[in-house]
UniProtKB/Swiss-Prot annotation:
Residues 87-109 have a biased composition (Basic residues). This is Ras-related protein Rab-26. One of its GO terms (biological process) is Rab protein signal transduction. Pfam families: Ras. Residues 1-115 are annotated as: Disordered. Participates in exocrine secretion. Residues 67-86 have a biased composition (Low complexity). One of its GO terms (molecular function) is GTPase activity. The keyword Metal-binding does not apply. A lipid is attached at residue 385 (S-geranylgeranyl cysteine). It is a lipid-anchor. It comes from Drosophila melanogaster. The modification Cysteine methyl ester is found at residue 385. Keywords: Cell membrane, GTP-binding, Lipoprotein, Membrane, Methylation, Nucleotide-binding, Palmitate, Prenylation, Protein transport, Transport.
Length: 388
């Protein structure tokens, strides 16, 4: 029984899919063919050339050469080998000359009944368990059958009779489940996280509080250009690296910050609850984000300076929640002075980035909206601010 490798991934006559264009000549040099492809003595190079020139159907088909890329293995039983089964002397003679090869295929068939097979899919090897019955009703393509048939009559009888001479030994044409392809999170990536918002909303104090745990009242002037710091957030034992950028909020620096949107992984958009203008400008900021940032960028809306007194507050908490729902982004109120929800905002970003950081996209196990809602702390002081 001869084992013949057939690439099933390529199309007929497609130079990029494993076979040459129609009309290309096969090599005449017999040494260019693998010795173990055809075993029968009657299958000579002249015989192969004769079969290649014999038309199939309307005569327009020109069988492609065996592709160099092997993606499937088909075990064939030739007509002559079927006759060996009925001719003990011939079978004995073949076995005498090639005992090791015959034993190899017997052992190979046993492996196909119980083995754990692998399916090669875009350079990713994924383990797949299959039963010995294979795939009921499956037939190889007519092109593959024609390529290795020993004559038109043999081919037609073989194909129409359920291709009894052909069977799959260890092939899985079904891709493995997506989680089998999923690669571990890459903890070496620096995830660019940008703080955005009008000048004076407290972005620098917010970052310093997260980075050092300190609040320095009145010690910062308006940020000029870009400043950054690096932090590592550990999420369920996995290190998520954040490269946090503090941007200038002034209009004259807006063209500078636009350039940083394009490769940003996450954006924290802040407004000042004591300054309604900064809240009103959020929609303009979101418009810029939609225009310049990546489509799947993580966005968190933040109402900062929530430690304010009731008389100072100009934006209700409910207004921030409504704006977040309107743009489908999570919302929370924070205080760089007291530390309220400052760490939570970066933790939410890190968890969302980890969830998305697998090779095949979101693992489907984390919802940033639920996480923020379940973990946002209610302000213990000045509660009347929320009920204005």
């Amino acid at each position: 029984m001869a084992s013949t490798a057939v690439g099933l991934g390529g199309g007929e006559g497609d130079p990029g899919a494993g076979g040459p264009p129609a009309g290309s000549a096969h090599p005449d040099d017999a040494s260019s063919m693998s010795d173990d492809v055809f075993e029968d003595a009657e299958t000579t190079q002249a015989r192969i050339e004769e079969l290649r020139r014999r038309p199939f159907g309307d005569g327009s088909y020109n069988p492609p050469a065996a592709p160099a890329s092997v993606s499937a293995s088909i075990t064939t039983t030739t007509t002559q080998q079927q006759q060996q089964h009925h001719n003990p002397s011939h079978h004995h003679q073949s076995s005498h000359h090639q005992p090791s090869h015959h034993h190899h295929h017997h052992h190979h068939s046993q492996l196909s009944l119980t083995g754990s097979h692998h399916y090669h899919d875009d350079a990713i090897m994924a383990p797949v368990q299959r039963s010995a019955t294979g795939y009921p009703g499956y037939r190889p393509s007519r092109e593959a059958m024609q390529m290795y048939a020993y004559g038109t009559d043999d081919y037609d009888d073989d194909y129409n009779d359920g291709w009894r001479s052909y069977r799959y030994d260890e092939v899985d044409m079904h891709p493995a489940p997506s989680n089998a392809h999923q690669q571990p999170f890459d903890d070496t990536v620096n995830h660019k996280t940008i703080l955005l918002g009008d000048s004076g909303v407290g972005k620098t104090s917010f970052l310093v509080k997260y980075n050092t745990g300190e609040f320095r009242l009145g010690s910062f002037s308006a940020t000029v250009g870009i400043a950054l710091t690096n932090k590592v957030v550990v999420v369920d034992g996995t290190r998520v690296k954040l490269q946090i950028w503090d941007t200038a909020g002034q209009e004259r620096f807006r063209s500078v910050t636009h350039a940083y949107y394009r490769d940003a992984h996450a954006l924290l958009l802040l407004y000042d609850v004591t300054n309604k203008t900064t809240y009103d400008n959020i929609r303009a900021w979101l418009g810029e984000i939609r225009e310049y940032a990546q489509e799947d960028v993580v966005i968190v809306l933040i109402g900062n300076k929530a430690d304010c007194s009731g008389s100072e507050r100009q934006v209700k908490r409910e207004d921030g929640e409504r704006l977040g729902r309107e743009h489908n982004v999570p919302f929370m109120e924070t205080s760089a002075k007291t530390g309220l929800n400052v760490e939570l905002s970066f933790t939410a970003v890190a968890r969302q980035l980890k969830s998305r950081g697998y090779e095949h996209g979101d693992d489907g196990k984390f919802n940033v909206h639920d996480f923020v809602r379940d973990n946002t702390k209610a302000r213990s002081v000045c509660a009347q601010c929320r009920n204005m």
